[in-house]
């Protein structure tokens, strides 16, 4: 459902933030 899509997107953002914290935001 949509909840899973949102959760996936948040997880993706977290991974990107961990890999490249300077580009957060």
Swiss-Prot record:
GO terms for molecular function: endochitinase activity; lysozyme activity. Its EC number is 3.2.1.14, 3.2.1.17. Keywords: Carbohydrate metabolism, Chitin degradation, Glycosidase, Hydrolase, Multifunctional enzyme, Polysaccharide degradation, Secreted. One of its GO terms (cellular component) is extracellular region. It comes from the Eukaryota. It is found in: Secreted, Extracellular space. Its main location: secreted. One of its GO terms (biological process) is polysaccharide catabolic process. It catalyses: Random endo-hydrolysis of N-acetyl-beta-D-glucosaminide (1->4)-beta-linkages in chitin and chitodextrins; Hydrolysis of (1->4)-beta-linkages between N-acetylmuramic acid and N-acetyl-D-glucosamine residues in a peptidoglycan and between N-acetyl-D-glucosamine residues in chitodextrins. Monomer. Belongs to the glycosyl hydrolase 19 family. Chitinase class I subfamily. Bifunctional enzyme with lysozyme/chitinase activity. This is Bifunctional chitinase/lysozyme.
């Amino acid at each position: 459902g949509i909840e899973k899509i949102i959760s996936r997107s948040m997880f993706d953002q977290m991974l990107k933030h961990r890999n490249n914290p300077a580009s957060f935001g």
